């Protein structure tokens, strides 16, 4: 019966899903020259239409109409997001084909951990309605709200987890060990976790391999953007990142950081906003050697997308990105915010610095974030601008805690100035 239900679900994935699934399969056998030919045709079409200048977040804020095609009611919709770097923005996306395309690529990545379409997932990231746990029947996913995992709810969470059949755990890299800490390592080892699906923050060097060896659980991991311009999977063979050539076009340009290149992306979507030579503000480590998996464009690592965690009022480390942004991109909330930054200088306390847009409802902003951070005292400060780091990159999190601020965290965490956004709300 389960197989029948899965077959029905896969049957409604849509024509774009099956088109891209076939394209992905074929592209893995392409030579480097075949990949260049496929990409150059589409990339040059964008250059002829929009020019060859490097674009920034602000270009799409100020001139969205210029970069948007076929903005037809019902066929397209407005996407509001915290943005790849935490700077809120909005753009237009295809209402149907985009989501089908996303599923094709993400399901391909998730298959590295053994996932098949509509296998059971437990998703520990983002905001959810209705308290601690919510089931999405269409996606076959149990969603656990990070904001509801306060100390008094942990007993219920642990009891519920013991009742589950085998499942895939869907997390941010920074929330994986938080989840283990919340449920307890002994219980986690007994849970029927088939694999881990880790969204597009970066694991600190060696962490992914260490987890897989320690727990005997495979991780599917990727690098992507909420702007849907480029997408790369983490290769289990070389541990680098391979960019899907049929998803979008990636350029690696020189930077001021030795051994690193700027990541520039261009999207291949036909409807909605087209991102052209878009500066992701991420850096990539130059590839070394070769990988026999495929001839996709490849980098050794992504720089500037490391985990960021805050310490709550119980001394636990939690993923800041999952709590701060999560699924807030589903409505007009981000239209009120131009920029924001979190600062922590003592456990259990967060300062939120907000650059509001004209007409912003400040009380709504404060209440929205207070609801997401019940395990910390939140102070909101409205400012005219967020300063950048000496290197010129904006920082959405400033961690001023001493390294020994918490004893309950049994896994080392890094504090870096940048974070990633997961591709889509699947």
Specify the residue positions occupied by each region the protein language model found.
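Residue-level recognition of short loop/turn positions
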Residues: 256-257, 314, 391
């Amino acid at each position: 019966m389960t197989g029948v239900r899965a077959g029905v679900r896969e049957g409604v994935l849509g024509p774009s899903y099956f088109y891209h699934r076939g394209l992905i399969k074929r592209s893995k056998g392409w030579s480097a020259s075949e990949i260049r030919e496929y990409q150059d045709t589409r990339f040059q079409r964008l250059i002829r239409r929009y020019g060859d200048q490097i674009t920034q977040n602000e270009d799409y804020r100020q001139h969205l109409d210029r970069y948007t095609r076929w903005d037809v009611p019902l066929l397209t919709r407005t996407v509001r997001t915290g943005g790849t770097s935490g700077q809120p923005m909005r753009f237009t996306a295809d209402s149907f084909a985009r989501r089908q395309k996303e599923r094709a690529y993400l399901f391909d990545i998730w298959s590295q951990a053994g996932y098949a379409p509509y296998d059971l997932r437990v998703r520990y990231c983002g905001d959810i309605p209705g308290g601690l746990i919510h089931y999405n029947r269409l996606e076959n996913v149990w969603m656990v709200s990070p904001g509801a995992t306060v100390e008094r709810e942990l007993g219920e969470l642990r009891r519920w987890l013991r009742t589950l059949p085998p499942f895939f755990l869907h997390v941010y890299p920074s929330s994986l060990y938080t989840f283990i800490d919340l449920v307890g390592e002994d219980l986690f080892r007994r849970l029927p976790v088939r694999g881990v699906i880790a969204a597009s923050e970066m694991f600190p060097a060696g962490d992914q391999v260490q987890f897989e060896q320690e727990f005997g659980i495979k991780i599917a991991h990727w690098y992507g953007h909420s702007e849907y311009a480029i997408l790369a999977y983490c290769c289990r063979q070389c541990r680098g990142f391979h960019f899907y050539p049929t998803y979008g076009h990636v350029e690696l340009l020189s930077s001021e950081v030795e051994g690193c290149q700027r990541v520039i992306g261009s999207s291949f979507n036909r409807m909605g906003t087209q991102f052209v030579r878009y500066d992701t503000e991420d850096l990539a480590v130059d590839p070394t050697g070769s990988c026999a998996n495929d001839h996709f464009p490849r980098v050794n690592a992504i720089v500037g997308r490391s985990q960021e965690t805050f310490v709550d009022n119980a001394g636990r480390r939690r993923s800041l990105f999952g709590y701060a942004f999560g699924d807030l991109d589903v409505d007009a909330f981000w239209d009120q915010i131009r920029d924001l930054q979190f600062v922590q200088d003592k456990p259990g306390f967060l300062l939120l610095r907000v650059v509001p847009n004209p007409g912003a409802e400040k009380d709504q902003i404060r209440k929205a974030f207070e609801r997401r951070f019940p395990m910390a005292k939140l102070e909101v400060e409205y400012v005219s601008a967020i300063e950048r780091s000496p290197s010129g990159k904006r920082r959405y999190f400033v961690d001023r805690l001493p390294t020994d601020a918490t004893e309950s965290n049994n896994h080392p965490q890094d504090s870096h100035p940048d974070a990633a956004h997961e591709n889509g709300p699947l």
